[in-house]
Amino acid sequence: QIYTAFKSAFSDYEISVDKTELKSMLKRRGFNPALSFGAFYDDNIVAFTFNGIGKYYNGKLTAYDTGTGTRKEFRGQGLAKRIFTHSMPFLKNAGIENYLLEVLQHNKRALKIYESLGFEILREFNFFTQKKQLVVNHLSDKPAKCSIVALKSEDILSAQSFHDFTPSWQNDIESIKRAGDDLVTLGAMVDSVLSGYCVFSPKSGDITQ
């Protein structure tokens, strides 16, 4: 039912995933079924909030909205807001201190709902995409002073100091560890010292870090 509900709720959005991709996404984002909630009609999920749980802000236990959606024919009934209100006592009882979510800026309906619930915008993300055949890599023409080697996720734990920003929830080191073999990690070694790295999904082309 989870995949059917997700596919139906996002059928008119710029989101398209198959069952395998949804499973990988939920695993990577720390999906917790016991702390996720839905609205049902005739035993079918018509609206839902899938929550991921982890330590994000200053090590505090945080819930992350992995996906909130409502089937088109059930929109306009305030189901998302009712689900969120219903979930709060359960999340607090589980020790959740923060609730984090992301929303597309042009989704004015969702923005209005979240603002009415007391959410504040902390930062904005840019999202870039390109067809792989149109990506131009000028670096391949230059002599390399480093060697590229395959790494494991634990190999980059000490390299988090390389960041000049805080990655989003789904790109955070904890999400990378949860993803396991769904992601590939490559490191740039100079004199056997890690000088840079890249984490990506070979299936989707997503560059994680």
What are the language-model segments listed below?
Residues 57-58:
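A flexible loop/linker signature enriched in serine peptidases of the S9 family
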Residues 67-72, 76-90, 112-116:
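Conserved acetyl-CoA-binding loop-helix of GNAT-fold acetyltransferases
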Residues 2, 19, 116-204:
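Amide-forming acyltransferase catalytic core, primarily the GNAT-like/NAT-type
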Residues 6, 12-42, 46-54, 162-185, ...:
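Active-site rim helix/loop that mediates acceptor-substrate recognition in acyltransferases
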